[in-house]
Design a protein with these regions (language model features):
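Short beta-strand-centered segments that line the small-molecule binding cleft or hinge
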Residues: 87, 110-114, 132-168, 172, ...
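N-terminal short secondary-structure element
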Residues: 1-31, 36
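Hydrophobic hinge/microswitch elements
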Residues: 130-143, 149, 200-259, 307-308, ...
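A short LG(V/I)-centered, amphipathic sequence patch enriched
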Residues: 41-61
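Central regulatory/effector-binding core of bacterial HTH transcription factors
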Residues: 92-154, 217, 223-224
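Beta-alpha-beta core module
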Residues: 155-166, 181, 228-277, 286
Length: 314
């Protein structure tokens, strides 16, 4: 039994039993993957996969039981490598971060800049995706830490910590009627075409809930996953925008105006997460604290010992 055999099984399950994709991910050949799986099955004494001819179609019952064990062995091996790197190369290595567009574009730059200055020999990888994709990248070992507002607390294998709270703003062109001195209300916002986030992104569900609670159905004419797109179409006059307040920069967004809407929509919480049981390098703890200063190493380590499924609050 060897790690490459175990990786072949894990990747086959992850990639829909497509051995071509597995071979590509493991930088080997498809026959090589098939051989690794067969040799492991022979050693174990049972089949891990249901087959249709030469194709894998699903896990067998025994395979479904074995897969979490295989994933645990591989996670342990990866942790062991990190331990070795921690003591052999304390200030060098790789840090992979998964984040939504809003976090990558607006929340992370200062932390990344400061971290790079302190750790020039650490290679940074930044992956962007939906909140669910961020969670999957953590679970699959593609990312060391993930940052998002939605979804992370829904995955029991993840340790989640609150980073910061934020609210939404309404953005409009200059001289828009909403810029008068009257109080901004949901009723007034609902009088105009709305451009905002796609469902599942950047607090969209809280925006919807706020309108529904008042019996309002806003005319959402366009949705997008990131604020830059929303701002572009507000500039074109398609409607007013509802975005995370952090996404508006008065110096850059000179053709727009922002109106604080913190009183209209519930507060959102952005969280940081990592896979439970993962050995974190010292520089990972430093990055986490650089991004969210209350999240010291002591706090993060305490969170990792909490009962699975609990969202750790600071």
């Amino acid at each position: 039994m060897n790690l490459q055999q175990l990786r072949s099984v894990r990747e086959a399950a992850r990639r829909g039993f497509n051995l071509t994709e597995v071979a590509r991910a493991l930088h080997t050949s498809q026959p090589g993957v098939s051989r690794q799986i067969r040799e492991l099955e022979q050693e174990l004494g049972f089949e891990l996969f249901v087959r249709a001819g030469k194709r894998l179609t699903s896990l067998t019952q025994a395979g479904a039981v074995a897969l979490p064990v295989i994933e645990g062995i591989l996670a342990g091996a990866e942790n062991l490598l990190r331990v070795g790197e921690e003591y052999a190369r304390q200030s060098a290595g790789k840090l992979s971060i998964a984040a939504t567009h809003s976090q990558a574009r607006y929340a992370l730059p200062d932390a990344v800049h400061d971290f790079r200055r302190r750790y020039p020999d650490v290679q940074l990888e930044l992956h962007q995706g939906s909140p669910q994709q961020v969670a999957e990248m953590l679970l699959n070992g593609e990312a060391d830490i993930g940052i998002a507002t939605e979804a992370l607390t829904e995955y029991e294998p993840l340790v989640t910590l609150s980073c910061y709270r934020w609210t939404h703003s309404v953005i409009v062109p200059p001289r828009h009627p909403l810029l008068d001195d009257e109080t901004l209300t949901l009723e007034r916002v609902a009088d105009y075409p709305v451009i905002t986030y796609s469902p599942g992104f950047s607090g969209r569900i809280r925006i919807d809930d706020a309108f529904h609670a008042r019996g309002l159905s806003p005319n959402v004419v366009l949705t997008a996953m990131d604020a830059d797109v929303i701002k572009t179409y507000v500039e074109l006059g398609l409607g007013i925008g509802i975005v995370a307040s952090i996404a508006f920069d008065e110096e850059r967004d000179t053709r727009l105006r922002a109106i604080d809407a913190g009183q209209l929509f519930p507060v959102n919480v952005t969280r940081l997460a990592f896979r439970r049981g993962t050995f974190l390098r010292s520089y990972v703890y430093d990055f986490i604290e650089t991004f969210a200063s209350p999240l010291t190493r002591e706090v993060v380590e305490q969170a990792a010992t909490q009962t699975p499924g609990i969202d750790f609050q600071i």
